[in-house]
Regions:
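Iron-sulfur-associated redox domains of electron-transfer enzymes in respiratory
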Residues: 2-107, 141, 151, 155, ...
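Ferredoxin-type iron-sulfur electron-transfer modules in oxidoreductases and energy-metabolism complexes
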Residues: 30-42, 89-254
Length: 254
C-alpha cells in the first residue's frame, strides 16, 4: 500500500472548471475507477462520475487519464507513474455536464440517422444461407461497447464539429451493416455526404484507443472509403450508371 495524489478536473455547465487534488491510498490491483470511488466516498461526496459494470463491457466510465483516453475501470493504477499525480479529466470532445460526466447524446442522435438492416427476401425454402468467412468478417465490429473514446480522440471531430462528421464509432456500425452478406440497403450516398466519410484522413488515432482492439481504420473505414470511391469517383462506374439510368428512362417512357 502507498499513498498518491489524485488530480481531478471538476466543473459544471456554468463553465467553472479547475483541478482539485486529493490524497488516495493505493492497494494492490486497484483500478483508476476504484481510486475515484475512494475520493468520492472519503473526500468529495458530490463528485460526479458515470460508471456501471466495472468490467470493461458497458463503456460508461470513459475519461482521460494522464492525458490519454481510457476506461477508468480497465486502467490499473500500478501501470501509471508513481512519481507524478494521477490526473483524471472528462472526455474533452463532448459538452461537460459535471465533473467527469459529459453529454454524449450527439452519438445517440447520430445513431438514429443510419438506415437499419434490410435483409434480402427469404429464398423459396425459407432458409437464409451465408458463407462463414462473411459472418466472421463483421464479428469484430459487434465488439463495440460504445465507450465513445474513438469519438473523443478523433481530430476530425475536434476540427470540423460534431454535426458534419459521424465519427469512427458509426463508421463501425455502417461497416457492420454494409458488409453483412444479407443486407440489401445502400448507405454510400449518406456516407459520402451527410456522414462526411471523406474527411477522415486515416491517422488511426481511433484504433489506438479502442479498448476492444477493433481495427477501426483498416477493417471498417478504409473498406468504406474504397466503396464510396468506386461508386462515385470511378469514371467507368459513372458511365455505367448513366447507361443504366437512360435504359430505365426508356423503359418507363410510354
Amino acid at each position: 500500500m502507498y499513498e498518491t495524489t489524485v488530480r481531478i478536473l471538476r466543473g459544471d455547465r456554468s463553465g467553472t472548471r479547475g483541478h482539485q487534488e486529493f490524497r488516495a491510498q493505493i492497494d494492490e490491483g486497484m483500478m483508476v475507477l476504484d481510486v475515484v470511488h475512494q475520493v468520492q466516498s472519503q473526500h468529495a461526496n458530490d463528485l460526479a462520475v458515470r460508471w456501471n459494470c466495472k468490467a470493461g463491457k458497458c463503456g460508461s466510465c470513459s475519461a482521460e487519464i494522464n492525458g490519454k483516453p481510457r476506461l477508468m475501470c480497465m486502467t490499473r493504477v500500478n501501470e501509471l507513474p508513481k512519481d507524478q499525480p494521477i490526473t483524471i479529466e472528462p472526455m474533452k470532445r463532448f459538452p461537460l455536464i459535471k465533473d467527469l460526466v459529459t453529454d454524449v447524446s450527439f452519438n445517440y442522435r447520430m445513431n438514429k440517422t443510419i438506415p437499419p438492416f434490410k435483409p434480402a427476401p427469404r429464398p423459396a425454402d425459407g432458409v437464409y444461407r451465408m458463407m462463414q468467412i462473411d459472418v466472421d468478417r463483421i464479428q469484430e465490429f459487434h465488439k463495440c461497447i460504445e465507450c465513445f473514446l474513438c469519438q473523443n480522440v478523433c481530430h476530425v471531430m475536434r476540427d470540423h464539429g460534431h454535426e458534419d462528421f459521424a465519427g469512427p464509432r458509426f463508421f463501425i456500425r455502417i461497416a457492420a451493416l454494409a458488409m453483412h452478406p444479407l443486407d440489401t440497403r445502400s448507405r454510400l450516398q449518406q456516407l459520402k455526404d451527410a456522414h462526411g466519410l471523406g474527411l477522415c484522413n486515416i491517422t488511426k488515432c481511433c484504433t489506438e484507443v479502442c479498448p476492444e482492439h477493433i481495427h477501426i481504420t483498416d477493417n471498417a473505414i478504409i473498406p468504406l472509403k474504397e466503396r464510396v470511391a468506386g461508386a462515385f469517383y470511378d469514371p467507368l462506374a459513372w458511365i455505367w450508371r448513366k447507361v443504366l439510368g437512360k435504359q430505365a428512362e426508356q423503359k418507363q417512357a410510354p
